[in-house]
Amino acid sequence: MAHKKGVGSSKNGRESESKRLGVKIYGGQAAIAGNIIVRQRGSKHNPGENVYISKDHTLHARVAGVVKFQKKRDNKSYVSIIPFEA
């Protein structure tokens, strides 16, 4: 007979924390300079006019304006900012 009670070990509890990726400012919405437009892994969306990409592939607005998503001839998605009229 066992002199110690058999203790099971859990096989749960390993799920990683979500990274909150995705589009943060959609097409037609306003953005100010420095705003995060898209958080992504890899370049799913590419930077267009007035948008820059950071080292983790996040797209940011370079100037204040309206966000525009478009696909070009190469069928890649590009994100641009159309500046507000001064």
Swiss-Prot record:
GO CC terms, sorted: cytosolic large ribosomal subunit
Gene3D superfamilies linked to this entry: 2.40.50.100
Alphabetized UniProt keyword annotations: Ribonucleoprotein, Ribosomal protein
Biological process per Gene Ontology, one example term: translation
InterPro entries given in the database record: Ribosomal_bL27 (IPR001684), Ribosomal_bL27_CS (IPR018261)
Highest taxon, organism lineage: Bacteria
One MF annotation (Gene Ontology) recorded for this entry: structural constituent of ribosome
Record-linked PROSITE patterns: RIBOSOMAL_L27 (PS00831)
Chain coiled-coil ranges: none
NCBIfam families: L27
Similarity comment text for this entry: Belongs to the bacterial ribosomal protein bL27 family.
Protein name: Large ribosomal subunit protein bL27
